[in-house]
Amino acid sequence: VTGISDTTGIFTLAALCSVALALYSLTLPHTPAPAKGMPVQFRDLLCADAFALLKPRHFLIFSLCATLISVPLGTYYAYTASYLADAGVKDVSTAMSFGQMSEIVFMLVIPLLFRRLGVKYMLLIGMAAWFVRYAFFALGVSEEGRFLLYLGILLHGVCYDFFFVVGFIYTDRVAGEKVKGQAQSMIVMFTYGIGML
């Protein structure tokens, strides 16, 4: 599979994986939405109950931080591969895949650290990791500092999992059963919507 990232074969592979996952999804058990059969209200479409969660200061601060952390993400997603190539990293797609591997590792670490650190400290570690990561990318353009680029890539797991995944868990806890779907949608709007504009 290595080496196809520079060809159109990567899209063929993605299409085949998508078809396989679509076929697999047909074998999953029927799970209707919790609100199935209930009337749709206009306030539900506007996520009015979720916006009420912004009244407590702690959730408002989290939402603002999530939005601000997402501002450079659009640039990261669009330009990191070309930036790494220009900085002299060989086989960029393989190098960047180590970021996803670290994400899997840290996803497994979250439950172990959740009890010890709690939500607040895990979010703080995640935010600090974003800062450190971008600093590594800024400082790693020289030949001597190239290892910082690789460390920045490996920090992807801490950055994403400790902030976004823990943030979604936190949102789920704060929102409660009734509005957790709206609350998750609102956070996605703040991060991948407003933040990445």
Can you say where each PLM-predicted feature lies in the sequence?
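Helix-to-loop junctions at the C-terminal end of transmembrane segments
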Residues: 2, 105-119
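Loop-to-transmembrane helix entry
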Residues: 8-12, 85-104, 147-148, 185-186
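C-terminal membrane-cytosol helix-exit motif in multi-pass small-molecule transporters
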Residues: 16-35
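Juxtamembrane intracellular "pre-TM" segments in multi-pass secondary transporters
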Residues: 30-63
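Helix-loop boundary and gating motifs at the non-cytosolic
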Residues: 58-66, 70-95, 164
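Loop-to-transmembrane helix entry/capping segments in MFS-fold secondary transporters
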Residues: 90, 175-188
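C-terminal ends and interior cores of transmembrane alpha-helices
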Residues: 128-143
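Intracellular juxtamembrane helix-capping segments at the cytosolic ends
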Residues: 162-176
